[in-house]
């Protein structure tokens, strides 16, 4: 077999690379490397003329290996693979050398050093390219069903979009009702629409949709499999009420003598020991709180449908689906961590979500904002922004995006209820980023007279007798220290990843970002996809966002998983672990390292050997790195390919020194 003929193509990327690297000098160096038949430069290799240049060179010089020195392969590798395929050679005979992010961007101002590094990187790429192999593809069937985990507005929207396309959808939520956080809100900014008025129709549509099956009060326990064939195990918690016969009439709750704090109202109101979380709950089914139930039997006595089941047990469900969407939402920041604000200590320090429940007409105070200490309407309220956001001390350096608008909305609603009330907002920056949001901000100032103080309060003091509060803050615009007497202080608590997000991410096999939210495959080009084919993410589970962005991303996630389900098949490139059975010693180190449970063992010729599941394997290479005998290799990244690349880099360094 003749030696491979390599072509090297260096991209200027406008001035991104050529501004820091002498691309022409790099081309000249590459043309002298062993095995290189042609080297060329072009301002934008990813553009049609650049692609044409590569195709023409393949045909003219009979090239069978291509090295592209350009930007990150995450963006343009598929483009260049398509170029090779169009030219009649395997798309896997491409070696992509990232001389932008790995060189030009980190060595700006050092043209000589950056050029030298680019030469070394390309030399390594050429040696690896010579040893590249074709990669087979495997086709798997995709079950035309999807499980949507989380039934807030994101999960509901994804489920409806998929159901309307004819796909079977399992909409799963751990709570008693679907609706999520949006169900707790009073109104939505900037239009001040009633939140439940626009959410409830979607909740009902999801419940009545012929292609959507609601599974509420259930938790994910295990997920196995791969795109097209995910096996999901759930535990459906007992309601102690038969779902098929309960009519939701409420007679049981009326008879129940026990009242406990209502979690849905954040403890501001009460519920019975047999309850629905809120009046518009879907499904409208009652649940017995066994922790507080005194087993008096009154609920069973008054139930005309005889739906009470005191002996109900948890139920395990096993469901097979082709794809998964994760839309599990968020947790509100625990404001007790900001001890200087006295949340949980001072009665009249509350959070924005608690205000939402107060001003909700169906909430515990029937739409009236009150002081928890005495039930009176506050005459002066202070909102404090960025509580648990943009704060490295509590580990949340990010902006939660919606807190400013929450405060603006609630401040205006409070002024509508009582025009004589005073409302202050202490802020560092007001981030009115969305459509109509800046106008909403101006309305709060000009029409409602909300007062804005640029500064983060240092601390809050309480008068133990009146329960009134004093907020101490520096107005950084005026250069003054202010002490504001307030009846009520509202903390704009930030949005955090769900506490169980790590456990779910592990079951799904997907990554999380440094803030704990689920990590997308690419922040710009694949914002709803994950590293696991067939699993998409949507809503605040991916990162803080408002309702319009959440709905848009939910629709995007539905579209992403609908593609393989519509086709009914999915092609998987077999960049997967392979086993040399003659060398494998059956030590099981690789199985311990595999995060995807893709490695099992079989006995052959009297000893154990590793067996890899080509579909479950994701090609991470952890097993190959750990294998003490070298029996485990990663196709397309075999030892000889990686070592060849290292040798090429070292040899180039010697050449450049001579």
Swiss-Prot record:
InterPro entries in the cross-refs: 4Fe4S_Fe-S-bd (IPR017896), 4Fe4S_Fe_S_CS (IPR017900), FAD/NAD-bd_sf (IPR036188), HdrA-like (IPR039650)
Binding residues for FAD: 150-173
EC number from the UniProt entry: 1.8.98.5, 1.8.98.6
UniProt-annotated binding residues for [4Fe-4S] cluster 3: 584, 587, 590, 627
An MF annotation (GO) of this entry: oxidoreductase activity
Cofactor, free-text remark: Binds 4 [4Fe-4S] clusters per subunit.
Keywords: 4Fe-4S, FAD, Flavoprotein, Iron, Iron-sulfur, Metal-binding, Methanogenesis, Oxidoreductase, Repeat, Selenocysteine
Matching PROSITE patterns: 4FE4S_FER_1, 4FE4S_FER_2
Transmembrane regions: none
SS bonds (residue pairs): none
One GO BP annotation of this record: methanogenesis
Required cofactor names: [4Fe-4S] cluster; FAD
Pathway: Cofactor metabolism; coenzyme M-coenzyme B heterodisulfide reduction; coenzyme B and coenzyme M from coenzyme M-coenzyme B heterodisulfide: step 1/1
Record: residues binding [4Fe-4S] cluster 2: 256, 293, 296, 299
Binding site for [4Fe-4S] cluster 4: 594, 617, 620, 623
Class of enzymatic activity (EC top level): oxidoreductase
Descriptive protein name: H(2)/formate:CoB-CoM heterodisulfide,ferredoxin reductase subunit A
Provenance organism: Methanococcus maripaludis (strain DSM 14266 / JCM 13030 / NBRC 101832 / S2 / LL)
């Amino acid at each position: 077999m003749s030696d491979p003929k390599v072509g090297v193509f260096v991209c200027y990327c406008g001035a991104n690379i050529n501004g820091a690297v002498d691309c022409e000098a790099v081309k000249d160096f590459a043309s002298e490397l062993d095995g290189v038949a042609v080297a060329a430069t072009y301002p934008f290799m990813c553009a049609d003329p650049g692609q044409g240049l590569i195709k023409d060179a393949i045909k003219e010089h009979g090239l069978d290996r291509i090295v592209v020195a350009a930007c990150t392969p995450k963006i343009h590798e598929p483009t260049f693979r398509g170029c090779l395929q169009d030219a009649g050679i395997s798309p896997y005979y491409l070696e992509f050398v990232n001389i932008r992010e790995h060189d030009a961007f980190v060595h700006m101002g050092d043209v000589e050093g950056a050029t030298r590094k680019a030469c070394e990187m390309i030399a390594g790429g050429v040696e690896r390219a010579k040893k590249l192999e074709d990669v087979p593809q495997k086709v798997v069937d995709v079950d035309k069903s999807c499980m949507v985990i989380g039934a807030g507005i994101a999960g509901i929207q994804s489920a409806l979009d998929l159901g309307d396309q004819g796909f079977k959808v399992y909409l799963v939520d751990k709570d008693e009702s679907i609706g999520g956080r949006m169900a707790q809100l009073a109104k939505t900014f900037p239009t001040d629409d009633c939140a439940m008025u626009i959410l409830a129709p979607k909740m009902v549509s999801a419940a009545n949709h012929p292609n959507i099956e609601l599974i509420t009060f259930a938790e994910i326990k295990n997920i196995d499999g791969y795109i097209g064939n995910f096996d999901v195990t759930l535990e459906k918690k007992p309601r102690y009420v038969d779902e098929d016969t309960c009519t939701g009439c409420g007679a049981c709750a009326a008879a129940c003598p026990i009242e406990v704090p209502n979690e849905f109202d954040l403890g501001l109101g009460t519920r019975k020991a047999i309850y629905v979380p809120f009046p518009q709950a879907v499904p409208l089914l009652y649940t017995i709180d066994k922790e507080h139930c005194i087993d008096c039997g009154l609920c069973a006595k008054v139930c005309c449908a005889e739906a009470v089941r005191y002996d109900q047990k948890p139920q395990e469900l096993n469901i097979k689906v082709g794809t998964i969407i994760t839309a599990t939402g968020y947790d509100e920041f625990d404001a007790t961590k900001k001890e200087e604000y006295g949340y949980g200590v001072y009665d009249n320090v509350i959070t924005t979500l608690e205000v939402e429940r107060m001003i909700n007409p169906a909430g515990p105070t029937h739409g009236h904002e009150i002081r928890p200490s005495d039930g009176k309407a506050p005459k002066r309220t202070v909102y404090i922004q960025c509580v648990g956001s943009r704060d490295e001390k509590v580990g949340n350096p990010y902006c939660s995006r919606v807190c400013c608008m929450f405060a603006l909305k609630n401040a205006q609603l409070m002024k509508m209820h009582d025009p004589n009330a005073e409302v202050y907002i202490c802020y560092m920056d007001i981030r009115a980023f969305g459509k109509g949001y800046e106008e909403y901000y101006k309305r709060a100032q000009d029409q409602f007279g909300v007062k804005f103080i640029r500064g983060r309060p240092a601390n809050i003091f309480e008068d133990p007798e009146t329960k009134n509060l004093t907020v101490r803050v520096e107005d950084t615009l005026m250069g003054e220290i202010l002490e504001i007497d307030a009846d009520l202080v509202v903390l704009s608590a930030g949005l955090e990843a769900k506490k169980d997000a790590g456990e779910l991410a592990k079951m799904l096999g997907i990554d999380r970002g440094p803030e704990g939210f689920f990590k997308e495959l690419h922040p710009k080009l694949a914002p709803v996809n994950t590293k696991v084919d067939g699993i998409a993410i949507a809503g605040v589970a991916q990162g803080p966002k408002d309702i319009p962005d959440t709905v848009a991303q939910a629709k995007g996630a539905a579209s992403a998983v609908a593609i393989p389900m519509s086709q009914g098949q999915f092609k998987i490139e077999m960049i997967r672990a392979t086993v040399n059975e003659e060398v494998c010693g059956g030590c099981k180190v690789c199985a311990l390292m595999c995060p995807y449970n893709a490695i099992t063992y079989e006995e052959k010729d009297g000893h154990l050997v590793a067996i890899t599941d080509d579909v479950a394997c994701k090609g991470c290479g952890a097993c190959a790195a750990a294998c003490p005998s070298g029996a485990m290799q990663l196709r397309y990244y075999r030892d000889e390919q990686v070592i060849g690349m290292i040798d090429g880099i070292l040899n180039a360094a010697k050449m450049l020194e001579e």
